[in-house]
From Swiss-Prot:
One of its GO terms (cellular component) is bacterial nucleoid. Its main location: cytoplasm. InterPro entries: YbaB-like_sf, YbaB/EbfC. Binds to DNA and alters its conformation. May be involved in regulation of gene expression, nucleoid organization and DNA protection. This is Nucleoid-associated protein CKL_3826. It comes from Clostridium kluyveri (strain ATCC 8527 / DSM 555 / NBRC 12016 / NCIMB 10680 / K1). It is found in: Cytoplasm, Nucleoid. Keywords: Cytoplasm, DNA-binding. Coiled coil: none annotated.
């Protein structure tokens, strides 16, 4: 490889600089992952009749259902609302994670990071 090294990795082909940059990047990734895991994301469905909260680990934290939407004659509608709210909350968590990753990597797509 020509002199100058890798862009954004300290230049000059200096292996110590490259290692320092890699360690710094790894620390930033760990910090971001920890921060995202502690965040909560919520979504609603059915005019806020259903509220779902998930965390950054993409685990459902809570589901709130307003009593007035519980209709024993139409359980399927309730199931659809819960499913919709869950999927929206999970998508919100995924979108935020992707956005933070993009900031950290400068838009470089690194498979398997999250």
């Amino acid at each position: 490889m020509a002199r100058g090294g890798f862009p954004n990795f300290g230049g000059g082909g200096n292996m110590n600089n490259l290692m320092k940059q890699a360690q710094k990047f790894q620390k930033q990734m760990e910090d971001m992952q920890s921060e995202l895991e502690n965040k909560e994301f919520s979504a609603t469905a059915g005019g806020e009749a259903i509220t779902v909260v998930v965390n950054g680990k993409k685990q459902i934290v809570s589901i709130k259902i307003k009593p007035e939407v519980v209709d024993p004659e139409d359980v399927e509608m309730l199931e659809d609302l819960v499913l919709t709210a869950c999927n929206q909350a999970l998508k919100s968590a995924e979108d935020q994670t992707a956005s933070e990753m993009k900031k950290l990597t400068g838009g470089l797509n690194i498979p398997g990071m999250f």
